[in-house]
Amino acid sequence: MDICREFFTYLNTNQVRYCHWKSTIRLSEGLNGKTDLDLLIHQNDKQSFDEALGKFDFKRILSPKWKRYPGVEDYIGFDRSTTALIHLHVHYNLVLGEKHLKGHHLRIEEYILKTRVFVDTMPVVQPEVELLLAIIRVHMKSEVYEIALNQLKKYLRPARPPYTTGIWEELVFLVKKTSPEIFRNVLRELNLPVSEQLFMDYLEKLSQSTISSHDILYLRQHIFERLRPFKRISPVHYSAIKAFIKLRTLPLMPALKNKKVLPETGRIIALVGADGSGKSTLVRDLQSWLSWKLSVRTVYFGIPESMVTSCVQTVNRVLGIAEKYLPGKQVKKNLRYIMRYTDAGQWIFIARGRLALFKKSRKLASSGSIVITDRYPLALFKSMDHPMDGPRLQSQAIYMPFAVNLEKSTYDQIGLPDRIFALQADFPALRKRKDNLDEQQHIKKVEAVNALKPSECIMPINVNRPYEDVLKDLKREIWRLL
């Protein structure tokens, strides 16, 4: 992608000391926005790296509090030509450890950066160093029950590798690029308190694909015992965090938050358009695009399918039939009176539900999430006889002023979103896509949306174009908003 090529060329030109330090087997995928790019940056080059991030419009994002570690930051970038996102997992400290708990800091950053090599123009960790780090990472992350389960599966299918497919592929990839003598020298130069012979034996078994579950368990125990001096937190703190994570991953417990959020506050985005403008499809695709790394929620403000609305509609249908066939003017009048109030109750219920959704959206945005809404109720459409997703009782002001005022006051509490994207198109184009609606109502909705003018909050989007062009334009505008 253009952004990767230009960004890393800039870092190289400005002599920023960095390298891609793990999973180089998937480097190409990372450079194309398919997976993370794990970068190690020299502490003394942090300012230069930060300047480069700003120059190329990378945006800081935050992991959930339980997944934040000192010297580790996250950024996302945007490739304008493809509209793909890339994720930089930036390390100033080499922090690693168990699954969900990076409790160790290996202070070997200087060595990794001094011995880096280049793949084309991309600096990467030396293969022998990467293999050593991969062995440590894999065995720290391996749980005893996972090793036992894998061994059980191996009994059923002997050809099965001793690790999961992804891990095995990475280890085999690195072994093929590793010289045993250089690997031994790396062990000696780093001087980590681990057994050189044990690691050399492991390398030989790995190259011959003869690793057993016993080998994995023994090496795992050895790594944890020998690297205890590299723990970055106290044993008590470490045990407390581990117990908390174990508890929260039990069945029926509230799931731990995994998605990243914006640093200060999130955004509420509204897609507004008449029927046939592609709102629902755009909401789905934008949610898929952003939720790769960010916490994204979609909120539908349309009329909900609920027991209340179903009951009201059934009651009014029955009352309508009764009003048509029962004799007596007074009876008919009373039935119309009842229908009017049950209908009003339904619209007030819908208004209260929309207000609750607005408050929920604000709460989500305040915690850094992005909220994408469909059929957002806007006061901008209040001049319509039947405002789109807005108050419906104005015409009943003579009969039930209290209900009208209650509905109006409810909608008045719903503020504007951070950005309204008005999906504007000619009526004939929308009619081709959606021709099963009342034509006059459809025309009024199209005219109302097309009447929206650009402002600080409103961004008109021309949808008289191929869908992919519309989607790319929306992605570019949303990126500017983040």
Can you say where each PLM-predicted feature lies in the sequence?
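ATP-dependent small-molecule kinase phosphotransfer cores
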Residues: 304-395
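Conserved lysine of the Walker
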Residues: 279
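Conserved NTP-donor binding/palm subdomain of two-metal-ion nucleotidyltransferases/polymerases, i.e.
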Residues: 1-35, 41-267
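P-loop (Walker A) phosphate-binding loop of NTP-binding proteins
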Residues: 274
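Hydrophobic positions on the alpha1 helix immediately C-terminal to the Walker A/P-loop
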Residues: 282
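NTP-dependent small-molecule kinase module
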Residues: 215-218, 222-240, 422, 428-482
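A glycine- and Lys/Arg-enriched "phosphate-lid" helix/loop adjacent to the NTP-binding pocket
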Residues: 375-451
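Short beta-strand-centered segment that lines the nucleotide-binding/catalytic pocket of NTP-utilizing
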Residues: 293-309
